[in-house]
Amino acid sequence: MCKLRVLFIVCLAAWAFVDSFATKKGRVGIEIGYLDSLPAEIDGGLCTFYKSLDDVEKDRYVLTNDSAENAYVMVNGKLEKLSLVANNDENYLYVNKDYKLTVKISGTRFSAKRDYNYIVAFLIIENRNHDKRKIKCYGFCGC
């Protein structure tokens, strides 16, 4: 009886280990990709955010929004639309059923010559599994 109990405990521990490994390996995480065009819903004022200043020249942006009401970001190869739920001068919080996106503004300059704002920000996106990705971005907002 004792041997059977030990065998059962060993099998249970082995199953838990294998299940835990498979769950961790199965997690996708968060990869932020580039948008290849503006979503059709955007009409009027917008902001676009880039991973690097080189991406600005190539017009390769990772986030765009329509006057801060909705944000669009490519996550794991899928275009996600998130809605604004809270904001102040430096933070914007967007959510949808799968993700929470925080845009933290760390610096802003206005260019009267070109009629837009230049922004330095951090994008923090989190999924329901609490996986997070944080990237520094450079943005331009205007009409």
Briefly describe each language-model feature range.
Residues G77, A86, I105-R109, G139-C141:
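A mature extracytoplasmic/lumenal domain signature
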Residues N88-R128:
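Acidic, glycine-rich flexible loop segments
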Residues M1-K24:
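Bacterial Sec-dependent N-terminal signal peptides
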Residues T23-V85:
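An ectodomain-focused feature that recognizes extracytoplasmic/extracellular
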Residues L82-S83, V103, I135:
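Short capping micro-motif at the N-terminus of alpha-helices
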Residues R133-C143:
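Short, low-complexity, Pro/Ser/Thr/Gly-rich segments in the mature regions of secreted, periplasmic
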Residues L46, L79, K100, D131-K132:
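Short, solvent-exposed loop/turn motifs
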